[in-house]
């Protein structure tokens, strides 16, 4: 397909032919020098700004650090206040404070003693089943099992199913019965149990501030049909003793059951007494 194309030709002017050999080239050399020394035309796209922008990114204006405020020391007397505070104690106050301190010393000594752990001072009632069953039929309530882990006392209680409405509580003391608490027990649905008995459970947290010399004891009460039945371990209550007291009790039992050991102690005491008397009287010649 033929296409018409227009081509624009730019032809520089040449010197006329009649001047080719007659005129000199001085004018043309001057014209060329002027064209070389002229500055080129400025392009439409300004690349200078983009180049500077990429090389020199904007930066925050630097500020000189502000000078820190100087610390000043001001005394109270410069503001009209007193430099000292005077407190006068009367002799009565001193005596009272001394007596209070002396009164608190025994409690402080007890508090500074290391905390002693406690253990159960009774056997598990259910281990002797015949005796346990006998006490249950007699008192209508009996402690079945009990464990002590740290400061948590847990256990189960068996009661006779006399009536539908019943209440089982554990009465416990932490200060030798000066005060006591009644803990309500929870009914356990024992599927494999007997129909004539019910099972209850309890959980008691023992305070960590209980003094070693204070006894921790508890007993069980069972209320049904307007009557209250008690299980107090045959009048001795269920006690929790410290390990130190337990060692003392075992030592006493060992001395009673071991007469040979007691005889050795007597012989040692007699020998010590004889040597002491010989030293006082002097040597015998």
Swiss-Prot record:
Tissue localization of expression is:
Ubiquitously expressed in the examined tissues including brain, muscle, liver and spleen under normoxic condition. Its expression is higher in insulin sensitive tissues (liver and muscle) than in the brain and spleen. Significantly increased expression in the liver and muscle under short-term (1-12 hours) hypoxia exposure. Significantly increased expression after long-term (natural) hypoxia exposure in liver and spleen. No significant differences in expression in brain for any time periods.
Locus of motif PP1-binding motif: 72-75
Q: Name one GO biological process term.
A: glycogen biosynthetic process
PROSITE patterns, per the entry: CBM21
Q: Origin, by domain of life?
A: Eukaryota
Family matches, as InterPro entries: CBM21_dom, CBM21_dom_sf, Pase-1_reg-su_3B/C/D_met, PP1_regulatory_subunit_3
Induction, per UniProt = Expression is up-regulated by hypoxia-inducible factor (HIF) under hypoxic conditions.
Q: Could you tell me one molecular function GO term of this UniProt entry?
A: protein phosphatase 1 binding
Q: Which GO terms describe its cellular component?
A: protein phosphatase type 1 complex
Going by the UniProt record, its keywords in alphabetical order are:
Carbohydrate metabolism, Glycogen metabolism
Q: Where is the CBM21 domain?
A: 133-241
Domain description from the entry? The N-terminal region is required for binding to PP1, the central region is required for binding to glycogen and the C-terminal region is required for binding to glycogen phosphorylase, glycogen synthase and phosphorylase kinase.
Record function comment: Acts as a glycogen-targeting subunit for PP1 and regulates its activity. Activates glycogen synthase, reduces glycogen phosphorylase activity and limits glycogen breakdown.
- Share what the entry says about its subunit structure, partners included: Interacts with PPP1CC catalytic subunit of PP1 and associates with glycogen. Forms complexes with glycogen phosphorylase, glycogen synthase and phosphorylase kinase which is necessary for its regulation of PP1 activity.
Q: What is this protein called?
A: Protein phosphatase 1 regulatory subunit 3C
Q: Which organism is it from?
A: Clarias batrachus
Q: Lineage from the top down? A: Eukaryota, Metazoa, Chordata, Craniata, Vertebrata
Protein's gene: PPP1R3C
């Amino acid at each position: 397909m033929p296409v018409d194309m227009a081509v624009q030709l730019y032809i520089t002017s040449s010197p006329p032919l009649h001047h080719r050999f007659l005129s000199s080239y001085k004018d043309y050399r001057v014209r060329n020098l002027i064209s070389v020394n002229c500055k080129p035309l400025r392009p439409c796209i300004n690349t200078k700004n983009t180049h500077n922008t990429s090389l020199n990114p904007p930066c925050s204006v630097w500020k000189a650090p502000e000078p820190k405020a100087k610390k000043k020391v001001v005394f109270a007397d410069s503001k009209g206040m007193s430099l000292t505070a005077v407190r006068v104690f009367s002799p009565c106050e001193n005596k009272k404070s001394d007596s209070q301190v002396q009164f608190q010393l025994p409690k402080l000594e007890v508090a500074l003693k290391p905390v002693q752990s406690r253990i159960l001072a009774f056997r598990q009632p259910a281990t002797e089943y015949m005796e346990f069953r006998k006490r249950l039929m007699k008192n209508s309530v009996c402690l079945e099992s009990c464990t002590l882990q740290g400061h948590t006392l847990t256990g189960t209680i068996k009661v006779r199913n006399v009536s539908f409405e019943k209440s089982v509580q554990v009465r416990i003391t932490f200060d030798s019965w000066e005060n006591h608490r009644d803990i309500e027990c929870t009914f356990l649905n024992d599927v494999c149990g007997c129909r004539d008995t019910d099972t209850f459970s309890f959980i008691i947290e023992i305070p960590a501030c209980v003094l070693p010399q204070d006894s921790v004891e508890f007993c069980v009460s069972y209320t049904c049909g307007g009557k209250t039945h008690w299980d107090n371990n045959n009048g001795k209550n269920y006690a929790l003793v410290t390990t130190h007291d337990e060692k003392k009790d075992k030592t006493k039992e060992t001395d009673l059951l071991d007469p040979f050991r007691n005889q050795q102690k007597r012989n040692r005491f007699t020998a010590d007494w004889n040597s002491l008397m010989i030293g006082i009287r002097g040597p015998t010649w």
